[in-house]
Amino acid sequence: MGQIEWAMWANEQALASGLILMTGGIVATAGQFTQWYLGTYSIAAGVLVCLLEYPRGRRTKGSTMERCEQKYMTKVVKAFGPLSRNYYIRAFLHLGLSVPAGFLLATILGTACLAIASGIYLLAAIRGEQWTPIEPKPKERPQVGGTIKQPPSNPPPRPPPEARKKPGEEAVAGVPRGAPRKTPCPVTDEVV
């Protein structure tokens, strides 16, 4: 049985916790809680976490399903270099972002989720995992000569293979090539 790639779990957990943190921040700010400024901090922290976590990393084995329009954010995250690739840095960044939001009831759920994501990222870093971007593979165009052995000789619709006659069979049957064939039923041009 293969090893678990913890970074994939941490990525999903952190993205969800960023959304939860933003939602709690909106509730705290709109509800004018006593420490509403922590709500605005939570909105900003949630947006930062979501932007950092939106692009999925490539799995070491198998294929990875890319998120919609991920390629644009991948370029931004990739530009930060080792700051975004290293999971130790992500773990401590998420843990640091979650602490101030823990002092407000509306954002405590997002704080707990982000702390759990931080722990999973720390586990992924200890196991030696690293973020690598999903890069699109260049599309190979099939060679026309390589895929088609011999193009069809007669236009569609074509009769089934067993009904087709070989060119030599008509000559053996005594029917000259291109000559009209005789039908067993009489054909008339009258319209009834």
Curated annotation (Swiss-Prot):
Where is it localised?
A: Cell membrane
Q: Where is this cross-link: Glycyl lysine isopeptide (Lys-Gly) (interchain with G-Cter in ubiquitin)?
A: 149
> Could you list which ranges are Cytoplasmic topological domains?
2-7, 54-69, 81-86, 127-192
GO cellular component assignments: NADPH oxidase complex; plasma membrane
**In what way does this protein cross or attach to the membrane?**
Multi-pass membrane protein
**Example GO biological process:** innate immune response
Could you describe the post-translational modifications of this protein? Phosphorylation at Thr-147 enhances NADPH oxidase activity by promoting NCF1/p47-phox binding. Ubiquitinated at Lys-149 likely by RNF145.
Under Pfam families, the record lists:
Cytochrom_B558a (PF05038)
Q: Which residues carry this modification: Phosphothreonine?
A: 147
Q: Transmembrane ranges?
A: 8-30, 36-53, 87-104, 106-126
Q: Which UniProt keywords apply?
A: Cell membrane, Electron transport, Heme, Iron, Isopeptide bond, Membrane, Metal-binding, NADP, Oxidoreductase, Phosphoprotein, Transmembrane, Transmembrane helix, Transport, Ubl conjugation
Region span, Disordered: 134-192
Q: Which residues lie on this side of the membrane: Extracellular?
A: 31-35, 105
Q: Which residues lie within the membrane without crossing it?
A: 70-80
Q: What GO annotations for molecular function exist for this entry?
A: heme binding; metal ion binding; oxidoreductase activity
Q: What does this protein do?
A: Subunit of NADPH oxidase complexes that is required for the NADPH oxidase activity that generates, in various cell types, superoxide from molecular oxygen utilizing NADPH as an electron donor. Subunit of the phagocyte NADPH oxidase complex that mediates the transfer of electrons from cytosolic NADPH to O2 to produce the superoxide anion (O2(-)). In the activated complex, electrons are first transferred from NADPH to flavin adenine dinucleotide (FAD) and subsequently transferred via two heme molecules to molecular oxygen, producing superoxide through an outer-sphere reaction.
Question: Which family does this protein fall into?
Answer: Belongs to the p22phox family.
Q: What quaternary arrangement does the UniProt entry report? A: Component of the phagocyte NADPH oxidase core complex/cytochrome b558 complex, composed of CYBB (heavy chain (beta)) and CYBA (light chain (alpha)). Component of the phagocyte NADPH oxidase complex composed of an obligatory core heterodimer formed by the membrane proteins CYBA and CYBB and the cytosolic regulatory subunits NCF1/p47-phox, NCF2/p67-phox, NCF4/p40-phox and the small GTPase RAC1 or RAC2. Interacts with NCF1 (via SH3 domain). Interacts with SH3PXD2A. Interacts with DUOX1, DUOX2 and TPO. Interacts with NOX4; this interaction mediates superoxide generation.
Quote the protein name from its UniProt record. Cytochrome b-245 light chain
User: Which organism does this sequence originate in?
Assistant: Sus scrofa (Pig)
